[in-house]
A protein has these predicted regions:
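Glycine- and acidic
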Residues: 122-123, 179-188, 228-234, 269-280, ...
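Auxiliary, metal-adjacent structural segments of Zn-dependent hydrolase domains
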Residues: 274-334, 347-348
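Active-site recognition of the HExxH zinc-binding catalytic motif
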Residues: 342-368, 389-390, 394, 432, ...
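Inter-helical turn/loop segments and adjacent helix faces that build the functional surface
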Residues: 230-231, 254, 258, 298-301, ...
Length: 563
């Protein structure tokens, strides 16, 4: 069914909550393991209609944040979502109370029962009102960001549409683009500062109600991190600071030499090549045709997937006024249909987001069609889900010539370099958030000062050269995740460590790398992050010294593939 033929009906929350109570009672009373397994499948399907409606509403709202009807529907789910989540948690609580619960681990793997325990530990009826308030705060942020229109080059442009100007070979044009963006954020400075303060206060209040010191502790439970915690993440960040950042300084020196910009400032960083960055082929149809060919040649599984996605028009990837920034993949369970949202801006990032979100969508497509995988175990934790997307960016490399033509080698270098350099920024975002939630009384200026300290630690090569907004340490406010889904960002770093290993493996044997990837994908959400890495034969990055060799291999490859 094509996306525009999918019907939306606001769900009956009362009926759903009553059904949840019934399922919880049945879970508590299930007489044996077989009955409990059957009931787990049943409860997993019970939310399909609700989730489909919620995701349809969110797709329509993010595609046009100015549409009053879809704004009202989004508000409905913001208001009712916490109650539905808590009802789901009560079902988990009932499963956990059943003496046969260990059968679920035997049937579905470690993440099933561990995930239910995290769900119970991460939710509380007393926080429902606070959760509703948090959702409303996020919607306010999305409206500020999604409603951004700036004047440049005689045009009204969205933030994503500034992308090509930021990559212009004329430094004055790049500076003007960043200043236009900065002007918009500075104009909303007071509101953005106030919003973030309210978000920190709200989430810390939720944590304290539930007996946690602050939200940085609760986040590990709510993010469903299984098998590791704050100490492992700290060790990971330390390895990045000590073993990756020194290599990145060499990489940035190579970039400066390559571009001929001897002393690059922040607005020079998007320039990767003296004669301009690689540009993908123009035109929606041409790109979609190339993507279809690419996925048909990659594997039979991806051929079936891309046909389904394109034939059912499950993409909205072109930027326009009123559309929310960013990119995502979501799922419409009733239709077993993934959906991909993006904001193309005619830079190489268009291919990044296409292959990235197709990685998420491919995993969802495969899991939704596996009868052994319950609906709520179709997707693993976010640090693992991002492996599907980030590794897909690299594993499609043999077909990138279809999208870049003569710029293919430039894109290969740019993409590998960007992914490697990203590790530092991702760790910076994570450490910043730990500081913010552990020190909630910091003033807006003090928050910005902390960000600038972390810039020196993780990205010492950056010179803001007096740039508004960024120069005062407020650039973090442009990072949607910090407002919308705190503590998510480190997941990108953990998955990048897996993706870089897939990249290095593919250089030696692409077929073997793809088969390892497919094994990982097919485990869906029924294995933890470390178990998934072991499935694919990859190193776990929490272990001391585990990153150093990968960092050296990446630097060596980048040194020998300068264009």
């Amino acid at each position: 069914m094509k996306f525009n033929e999918m019907t939306y009906t606001r769900p009956d929350i009362g009926a759903l909550l009553a059904r949840c109570k019934e399922l919880a009672a049945k879970a508590a009373a299930a007489p044996d393991g077989d009955a409990l397994v059957r009931l787990y499948y049943e409860q997993s399907e019970a939310f399909a209609e609700y989730n489909t409606a919620a995701n349809l509403a969110n797709i329509h709202y993010t595609c046009d944040t100015r549409d009053a009807y879809w704004k009202a529907e989004q508000d409905f789910f913001d208001a009712n979502g916490p109650a539905v989540t808590n009802a789901s948690v009560e079902i988990s609580r009932a499963f956990l109370a059943n003496p046969h619960v260990d059968v679920l681990t035997a049937k579905f793997g470690t993440t099933c029962v561990a995930g239910m325990k995290n769900a119970v530990l991460g939710m509380d009826d007393r926080t429902v009102e606070l959760q509703q308030q948090f959702n409303a705060l996020v919607s306010r942020y999305q409206q500020i960001y999604g409603g951004a229109l700036v004047e440049l080059d005689g045009k009204q442009l969205t933030i994503p549409q500034l992308g090509p100007y930021k990559e212009d070979l004329d430094p004055a044009v790049r500076r003007a683009a960043y200043e236009a963006e900065a002007g918009y954020f500075d104009a909303h400075r007071a509101e953005l500062d106030e919003l973030y303060g309210e978000i920190v206060k709200n989430l810390n209040a939720q944590a304290r109600v539930m007996g946690y010191h602050d939200y940085s502790e609760l986040s590990y439970v709510r993010m469903n991190r299984i098998g590791y915690g704050p100490e492992e993440i700290r060790k990971f960040r330390d390895q990045v600071a000590n073993d990756v950042v020194p290599q990145l300084q060499k990489v940035m020196a190579l970039r400066a030499k390559r571009t001929g910009i001897a002393r690059p400032t922040f607005t020079d960083l998007p320039i990767m090549f003296k004669d301009g960055n690689p540009k993908p082929i123009p035109g929606y149809k041409a790109r979609m045709d190339a993507a279809r060919t690419m996925y048909h040649e990659l594997s039979p599984e991806t051929a079936e997937f891309i046909d389904f996605m394109q034939d059912n028009e499950l993409f909205d990837v072109e930027s326009r006024p009123g559309k929310m920034s960013g990119g995502y993949m979501t799922s419409l369970p009733t239709y077993k249909a993934p959906f991909i949202f993006a904001n193309w801006n005619n830079t190489s990032a268009d291919v990044d987001v296409l292959t990235h979100e197709c990685g998420h969508a491919f995993e969802g497509y495969v899991a939704e069609r596996d009868p052994e995988v319950p609906a709520d175990l179709e997707c693993p934790g976010m640090e693992s889900a991002e492996i599907h997307s980030m590794a897909m960016e690299f594993l499609t490399a043999p077909w990138h010539h279809l999208l870049f033509g003569r710029d293919t080698d430039k894109y290969a270098l740019l993409h590998a370099e960007d992914s490697f350099v990203f590790l530092a920024y991702g760790c910076e975002v994570d450490e910043f958030q730990h500081i913010m939630y552990q020190n909630p009384d910091l003033t807006p200026d003090e928050r910005n000062a902390e960000w600038l300290k972390l810039e020196k630690k993780y990205r010492p090569w950056i010179d803001f050269a007096g740039l508004p907004f960024y120069g005062r340490g407020a650039g973090w406010q442009r990072q949607l995740h910090i407002y919308e889904c705190p503590f998510y960002y480190i997941d990108y770093c953990l998955s990048t460590m897996a993706a870089l290993q897939f990249f290095l493996l593919s250089l030696d044997d692409h077929k073997d790398a793809w088969e390892r990837y497919l094994r990982l994908v097919r485990r869906a959400g029924m294995a933890s992050y470390t178990e998934l890495l072991e499935t694919a034969g990859l190193k776990v990055p929490f272990e001391e010294g585990s990153i150093k060799g990968i960092a050296q291999q990446m630097t060596d490859w980048l040194e020998t593939h300068q264009v």
